[in-house]
Amino acid sequence: SLIQFETLIMKVAKKSGMFWYSNYGCYCGWGGQGRPQDATDRCCFVHDCCYGKVTGCDPKMDVYSFSEENGDIVCGGDDPCKKEICECDRAAAICFRDNLTLYNDKKYWAFGAKNCPQEESEPC
């Protein structure tokens, strides 16, 4: 679920997904089009693609299980679909953490769809 995604971002990247990633570049936030603008935006693009491959459950609403082991997030549970959602969220949170030094809110916060032409979109 989106609430769990926020939790994973806080645990892994030590940032609020709502305040840092909900309206950034062309892909961080609801929907997405155009070219990813930087490494952080690419994290969101890959996350959107990952969600797009999930079938049989709702990535934004379904609750999954995870645990922390030696500082790492481990996705668990018996439902393979929910585990897949967790893996999408886990990978994005790690990507955000690994690209924190490249995050550029002055340039890409509230970037706007007008700067993300649909015709420049790339496939997943």
Curated annotation (Swiss-Prot):
4Fe-4S keyword on record: no
PANTHER family, A to Z: PHOSPHOLIPASE A2 FAMILY MEMBER, PHOSPHOLIPASE A2, MEMBRANE ASSOCIATED
The UniProt record lists the keyword RNA-binding: no
Cofactor(s) essential for the protein: Ca(2+)
Keywords: Blood coagulation cascade inhibiting toxin, Calcium, Disulfide bond, Hemostasis impairing toxin, Hydrolase, Lipid degradation, Lipid metabolism, Metal-binding, Pharmaceutical, Platelet aggregation inhibiting toxin, Secreted, Toxin
Description of how the protein assembles with itself and partners: Monomer.
Name assigned to this protein: Acidic phospholipase A2
Catalytic activity annotation: a 1,2-diacyl-sn-glycero-3-phosphocholine + H2O = a 1-acyl-sn-glycero-3-phosphocholine + a fatty acid + H(+)
